[in-house]
Amino acid sequence: MLTHKQLELLDFIQKRMARDGVPPSFDEMKDALDLRSKSGIHRLITALEERGFIRRMAHRARALEIVKLPESMERAAEAERGLQTQPAFTPMLIAGSRTEPPRGALPVAAAALDIPMMGRIAAGVPIEAIAEVAHHVTVPGAMLSGRGEHYALEVKGDSMIQAGINDGDIVVIRSQPTAENGDIVVALVEDLEATLKRYYRRGGMIALEAANPAYETRLLREDQVKVQGRLVGLIRSY
């Protein structure tokens, strides 16, 4: 699973290598992704290498090699080369017998909805934002706050434990670009990292506050933070 920026960089590298036969320079990558510094490119390259999509080769200039592409990008590349791709597998569904629920069962399933599980979100030190659907999870319809898109994330870390959010919990997020003071939000920091924190406006700055005294509040400029959604529910497995 890759972030939007990781996908954008991998796509840029793949297209440039197909055209020129060599990878682009770090300056070209920085300009293509509209990043302020090459350090962001280094982090994206490292993430792509750790996930097995590219390989850095020692003692060679512009030493990058594409090992594999995500399925969606591979199909696009094959289409550009004029190759016919195989249709996606469609499973055959067999209807089973319908049984009555056990006595005393809560009528949750009847009002349950599937929402996309988008991967992990940091409740601690920010980790890479996830922008691809991993799978879907079923949640009670009453948990979804009115209209709008919703998605789920697995919590990684302990910075929100005093808000009742533990490592391994599944949080349900309503997708929205704004937040009120005190909301627990998914915040995208500098288009590279995502974190789950309480949101506060302080003058011209944004404070991302943990619910654990072991973590410091982060103060960032408004242009460094994008709200990706607001917490509306939580699922915990025992």
Curated annotation (Swiss-Prot):
Reaction(s) catalysed by this chain's protein: Hydrolysis of Ala-|-Gly bond in repressor LexA
UniProt xrefs under InterPro entries: LexA, LexA-like, LexA/Signal_pep-like_sf, LexA_DNA-bd_dom, LexA_repressor, Peptidase_S24_LexA, Peptidase_S24_S26A/B/C, WH-like_DNA-bd_sf
Site feature: Cleavage: A123, G124
Keywords: Autocatalytic cleavage, DNA damage, DNA repair, DNA replication, DNA-binding, Hydrolase, Repressor, SOS response, Transcription, Transcription regulation
The enzyme's E.C. designation: 3.4.21.88
Pfam families, per the entry: LexA_DNA_bind, Peptidase_S24
Segments of the chain annotated as binding DNA: 26-46
Record-level Gene Ontology MF annotations: DNA binding; serine-type endopeptidase activity
Keyword Transcription regulation part of the UniProt annotation: yes
GO annotation (BP), single: proteolysis
Assembly: Homodimer.
HAMAP family for this protein: LexA
The name this protein goes by in its record: LexA repressor
Organism listed in the record: Rhodobacter capsulatus
Taxonomic placement: Bacteria, Pseudomonadati, Pseudomonadota, Alphaproteobacteria, Rhodobacterales
